[in-house]
Amino acid sequence: MDRETILNAVKEARKNAKPRNFNQSVDLIVNLKELDFSRPENRIKQNVILPHGRGKESKIAVIAKGDLAAQADEMGLTVIRQEELEELGKNKKNAKKLANENDFFIAQADMMPLVGKTLGPVLGPRGKMPQPVPANANLKPLVERFKKTVSINTRDKPSFKVLAGTEKLNDEELAENIDAILSTVARQYEKGLYHVKNAYTKLTMGPSVPIKE
């Protein structure tokens, strides 16, 4: 799938979507073929840094205490301290809500055993286990990276949907973001994009448009 093919699909998707009074997401849907997803090595679980960013803010939660929690507070991030973490371990409904509301999690390294015990059963299946950092870490570079990052997680299914940006990005930027995602998929397999059965792009309120040669 060359850049021109992707670009044409993006233009078509934008044209077919009805205008809305919010910044619509642009998604990429990929269906894979001739792979046995009961074998873990065929599954994709990868973060992709989009060259033109997500087009909207990433929601990031930091599990920390002391200075690291204070730093996260100053940056306006969601902060989960030890007491709250222990409470979440007892309340699965609230734990699921937290998992669904945030795109990425960062955790102070010495709190990871407690994170695994309390939130592991909720975050693990969603592919959202926290990035561990030392207590004296500078969060800014990691947060800046997460602001441009999306996650591919096929689990045991031969398909995935992932954010490629929003309609506020121009067509060329969206095409480059989609190309970056597809390049990540290609690197996972010896036969590269041969294993892509088909791919589509769409805006939130629009129909799916095939990316075809």
Swiss-Prot record:
What Gene3D superfamilies does the database record attribute to this sequence? 3.30.190.20, 3.40.50.790
- Gene Ontology MF: a single term: rRNA binding
- Which PROSITE patterns has this protein been placed in? RIBOSOMAL_L1
Coiled-coil residue spans: none
Question: Pfam families in the record, alphabetically?
Answer: Ribosomal_L1
Alphabetic keyword roster: Repressor, Ribonucleoprotein, Ribosomal protein, RNA-binding, rRNA-binding, Translation regulation, tRNA-binding
Q: Would I find Manganese among this entry's keywords?
A: no
Q: Name one GO cellular component term.
A: large ribosomal subunit
Q: Which GO terms describe its biological process?
A: regulation of translation; translation
Q: Which PANTHER family match?
A: 54S RIBOSOMAL PROTEIN L1, MITOCHONDRIAL, LARGE RIBOSOMAL SUBUNIT PROTEIN UL1M
Instruction: Describe its function.
Output: Binds directly to 23S rRNA. Probably involved in E site tRNA release. Protein L1 is also a translational repressor protein, it controls the translation of its operon by binding to its mRNA.
- Protein family: Belongs to the universal ribosomal protein uL1 family.
Assembly: Part of the 50S ribosomal subunit.
Q: What is this protein called?
A: Large ribosomal subunit protein uL1
The organism encoding this protein is Methanococcus aeolicus (strain ATCC BAA-1280 / DSM 17508 / OCM 812 / Nankai-3)
